[in-house]
């Protein structure tokens, strides 16, 4: 039996789509030195090659892919978007605006200089910024621009062509820039990170290994009684001195949960909760030959929960003001926008931040109720909320504003992005509403993006050879300029106008470019995770601004003549 693969793929859009995805994902795992191609460029290359052979796909699949991707970008940005927009994140907002705005202006200028159409110009901007949200926003706006069919088809083909030709240029140039730009300025990045660490009390905690607290029991002897000198637990400050917290006391056979007025007596058996290294550092009067095994005394359920910051008495407060240790709880991690932050007493909490807290189950529940809620440990997605807000986003995208002879429409990209932000924001405020496990959200987002990339590649593949010959050199030059010049402008603005700490500034610059590989290089150069504070500050707002940049560049292009 002979199987004609070409006819089989041309006759089955679903089969063609998943063949492109599978081959592209395999290609994306290849490395060029220390640089991995990545899923999006792998799928794009495979789809362009197959597109040259005149394979095509139903455009409805392409549209659904970009809609899912943009909606999920909004959901991820939602919990932190408004806090960054309205509060003390104004520096991060301004940095993101400078980065995206300067790239947009430069791309428009280069597009006019080289005589390109809007498709090539927007594609070059998206590729140079390694930003699929720009590509998606521009593609959606082109569909609603009112172009005639032939002109629209050419613009969409050029959009994906420009992206394909400049993506690797943008990625490699930014990674090289992240490695060498810190060395060209007069402040050492490691010194800047250490300065922030000293100012914020991170010298000991920033590199602390995270362990779960353990519970051990000790008998109070004469040495320990002498050590306490008749002071009650509040006056002793056991946690400040030892790093452990007295959770229970057995006295005369009776178990009790002590309060601050309790005084240790000879023969008491005490249960201490703390990290393993804290137990190891205990004064010898606690440890030497005095550890006991008491099943009832040690019968305690130590849990680790992810607590989402929500309540007004926690939002805007510093970590130190929560006084978790005073409530017998231990902080393991601080996560913002899927980025792990340094455990810094001076970090100001935003709504939607996630604190990983360990301690007795009752105490963790109490502290969670005080600052927010315990994240639902469920693998069940609230599909009703997901679908409802998706519909709302599409309806918002249909809104059109008429100004005399000029009409302006929101478009699906802006509508779905706004609806996604609202769903993410409401999820951060209502624990039982709109829950989407991070794994599920990432899968839908990645799948939507890959479907979109496959569609644009298959569509543009037939014209790539002509495009390479005519504009390849121009694209190389333009890609380098749009990738690196906004980074330099952003650095100058942050360093000399905002006067930001260099470690935070470089992290924020990589966040404004939404480039995780470059962020890793900055952290390695600083030998610290301090830059993650800046990265998280700009990342969420940059994703939104980049999507809007794709819309704006298409809208303003006709007016530039």
Curated annotation (Swiss-Prot):
The gene is ybjL. It is a multi-pass membrane protein. GO terms for cellular component: plasma membrane. The keyword Repeat applies. The chain crosses the membrane at residues 8-28, 32-52, 66-86, 94-114, 158-178, 383-403, 406-426, 451-471, 475-495, 540-560. Residues 200-288, 292-373 form the RCK C-terminal domain. It is found in: Cell membrane. Signal peptide: none annotated. Belongs to the AAE transporter (TC 2.A.81) family. YbjL subfamily. InterPro entries: AAE_transporter, RCK_C, RCK_C_sf, Transp_YbjL_put, YidE_YbjL. GO terms for biological process: potassium ion transport. It comes from Shigella flexneri. This is Putative transport protein YbjL. It comes from the Bacteria. Its main location: membrane. One of its GO terms (molecular function) is monoatomic cation transmembrane transporter activity. HAMAP family: YbjL (MF_01015). Keywords: Cell membrane, Membrane, Repeat, Transmembrane, Transmembrane helix, Transport. Pfam families: Asp-Al_Ex, TrkA_C.
